[in-house]
């Protein structure tokens, strides 16, 4: 999975797909009451990027629904995963539940269309810290109350704050969640980061019987040398400001035999087991 990073304006969606992304990540900004308002990152952000591009959240969902609905004139078959970077750290953790209700409702109304020809992409909920876990409970509660639990099959969870892996596991156990789990490791592109935690994450993923990590991605990678390092370790995904560079690296002999771009037929919630 090549995840285009910080794709926050509507016109950026197709640009990142044209560069080779098959997944996009966008920031969801909330008001003080936990209402999702905009796709917006703000200052500071990654080096070399414009931090203030944005769209109204519901309008953005309307657009990506079209891009991921077969038969729609805007349909792009390559876009298979939407990663919502939920900016919950900007609001009180007591509002995490309200935020989960709001995001689930807006996805039902503007993306899934409550079963009437909605978008088909998988949804990854990127949650900053384990203390925001009530967002997940609220999201699942809302799908159940609204009679649309079928969409749980399309939804995955990821904690992005580089926290202790055992603390993350404990929270997932508390929530009763042991599937559809990604684990990210990374930092803003301007700052160097070693591989110590990433190696631990991959080791957990590859431990037989360990349920709390199915897929792993590294972020935000901009240099081809760091992309090679992460791919050599065996990540499932790379988040980048430059999907075209990831595409070039994947074509190198060392990686072209081992990796290919994920398509809609690939399940993003299953552990990959090489044949």
Swiss-Prot record:
Entry superkingdom: Eukaryota
Cofactor annotation comment: Binds 1 Mg(2+) ion per subunit.
Entry EC no(s): 4.6.1.-
Binding site for Mg(2+): 25, 27, 85
Annotated catalysed reactions: an N-(acyl)-sphingosylphosphocholine = an N-(acyl)-sphingosyl-1,3-cyclic phosphate + choline; an N-(acyl)-sphingosylphosphoethanolamine = an N-(acyl)-sphingosyl-1,3-cyclic phosphate + ethanolamine; a 1-acyl-sn-glycero-3-phosphocholine = a 1-acyl-sn-glycero-2,3-cyclic phosphate + choline; a 1-acyl-sn-glycero-3-phosphoethanolamine = a 1-acyl-sn-glycero-2,3-cyclic phosphate + ethanolamine
Membrane-traversing stretches: none
Active site per the UniProt annotation: 5, 41
Keywords, in A-Z order: Cytolysis, Dermonecrotic toxin, Disulfide bond, Hemolysis, Lipid degradation, Lipid metabolism, Lyase, Magnesium, Metal-binding, Secreted, Toxin
Family: Belongs to the arthropod phospholipase D family. Class II subfamily.
Name listed for the protein in its UniProt record: Dermonecrotic toxin SpeSicTox-betaIIA1
Organism listed in the record: Sicarius peruensis (Six-eyed sand spider)
């Amino acid at each position: 999975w090549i995840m285009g990073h910080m794709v926050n304006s509507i016109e950026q969606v197709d640009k990142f797909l044209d560069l080779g992304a098959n997944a996009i990540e966008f920031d969801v900004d909330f008001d003080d009451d936990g209402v999702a308002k905009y796709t917006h990152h703000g200052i500071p952000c990654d080096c070399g990027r414009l931090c203030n591009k944005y769209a109204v959240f519901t309008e953005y969902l309307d657009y990506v629904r079209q891009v991921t609905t077969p038969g729609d004139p805007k349909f792009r078959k390559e876009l298979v995963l939407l990663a919502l970077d939920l900016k919950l750290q900007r609001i009180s953790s007591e509002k995490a539940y309200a935020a989960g209700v709001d995001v689930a409702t807006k996805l039902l109304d503007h993306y899934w269309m409550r079963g009437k020809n909605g978008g088909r992409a998988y949804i990854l909920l990127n949650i900053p810290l384990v203390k925001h876990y009530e967002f997940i409970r609220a999201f699942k509660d809302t799908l159940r109350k609204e009679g649309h639990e079928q969409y749980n099959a399309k939804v995955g969870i990821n904690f992005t704050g580089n926290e202790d892996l055992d603390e993350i596991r404990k929270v997932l156990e508390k929530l009763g969640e042991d599937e559809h789990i990604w684990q990210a490791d990374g930092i803003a592109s301007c700052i160097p980061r070693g591989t110590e935690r990433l190696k631990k994450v991959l080791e957990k993923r590859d431990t037989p019987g360990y349920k709390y990590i199915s897929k792993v991605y590294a972020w935000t990678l901009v240099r081809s040398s760091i992309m090679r390092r992460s791919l050599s370790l065996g990540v499932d995904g790379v988040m980048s400001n430059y999907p075209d560079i990831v595409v070039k690296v994947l074509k190198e002999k060392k990686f072209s035999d081992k990796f290919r771009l994920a398509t809609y037929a690939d399940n993003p919630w299953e552990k990959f087991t090489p044949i």
